[in-house]
Amino acid sequence: MAKRIQFAAYGGPEVLEYRDYQPAEPGPREVRVRNRAIGLNFIDTYYRSGLYPAPGLPSGLGSEGAGEVEAVGSEVTRFKVGDRVAYATGPLGAYSELHVLAEEKLVHLPDGIDFEQAAAVMLKGLTTQYLLRQTYELRGGETILFHAAAGGVGLFACQWAKALGVQLIGTVSSPEKARLARQHGAWETIDYSHENVARRVLELTDGKKCPVVYDSVGKDTWETSLDCVAPRGLLVSFGNASGPVTGVNLGILSQKGSLYVTRPTLGSYADTPEKLQAMADELFGLIERGDIRIEINQRFALAEAARAHTELAARRTTGSTVLLP
């Protein structure tokens, strides 16, 4: 037997239960990982609330973690018992002591990166990789807008953009978060609690606006984001922290300057083991060179997952949060 977090109904943090369960034996192409650290991500709240339906109830939760290979299936070729591994695209169930995944979902973890760092960086770091390097390939000298710059993905984006020679304007909700974003490489910050974001972007870009805007907030920032994109520029919508964007009239894109909009997801970019490992290797390289540092500002025991979700929803967290089995 092992312990895991599960939910039998959709709802708030109170639906999360810390339960005993029987881990499955790995199938022929599967690996069982003993988690040493587990990542907490906003997407976890979408599954818990039912915004993203789980495959069935009761369900496990979480998709990111790091640990050691405990058992392998008969046809596994890339991993052996004892290997240090990390993952971010597996099935729901990472909030557990033991997790079974297809071997294609795992990456090898370098010795220079510990389990907590890996669990804190995998999903957010790989998300940052595809956003800045693939969805739109940033070039040095460009000025971009990134919402929620002091959040988990935001702090990685600040650092990665700086390493690329890109000027990142980050939106934040407080002076403390503004300082945090700047400490991580943001060129400028806009405090949306008392500043007009679109007006400040016009000022900071000499009226040119931004070739790309990254928005994980959703409903509350949709109109503002469109107003910050330069003509024929791209709005990258990659989250729904304030709720999903609905009722969109596509004509607004022509009115705002023939804009493009995309709604990417990690799975579409890391769709082969080779691509996933290559993306992870680029991320790990930046960490080992010191271009990206990992801020783990909150740690919770696995049994405290409900409290961790409460803190995340209230936006009382900064940087990354990990759960410890």
From Swiss-Prot:
Name of the featured protein: Quinone oxidoreductase
Keywords (A to Z) from UniProt: NADP, Oxidoreductase
Gene Ontology MF: a single term: NADPH:quinone reductase activity
CC annotations in GO: cytosol
Pfam families documented for this protein: ADH_N, ADH_zinc_N
Organism: Pseudomonas aeruginosa (strain ATCC 15692 / DSM 22644 / CIP 104116 / JCM 14847 / LMG 12228 / 1C / PRS 101 / PAO1)
Lineage: Bacteria, Pseudomonadati, Pseudomonadota, Gammaproteobacteria, Pseudomonadales
Keyword Protein biosynthesis in record: no
Catalysed conversion reaction: 2 a quinone + NADPH + H(+) = 2 a 1,4-benzosemiquinone + NADP(+)
Coiled coil spans: none
Alphabetical list of SMART domains matching this protein: PKS_ER
Family designation: Belongs to the zinc-containing alcohol dehydrogenase family. Quinone oxidoreductase subfamily.
Keyword Phosphoprotein annotated: no
EC number of this enzyme: 1.6.5.5
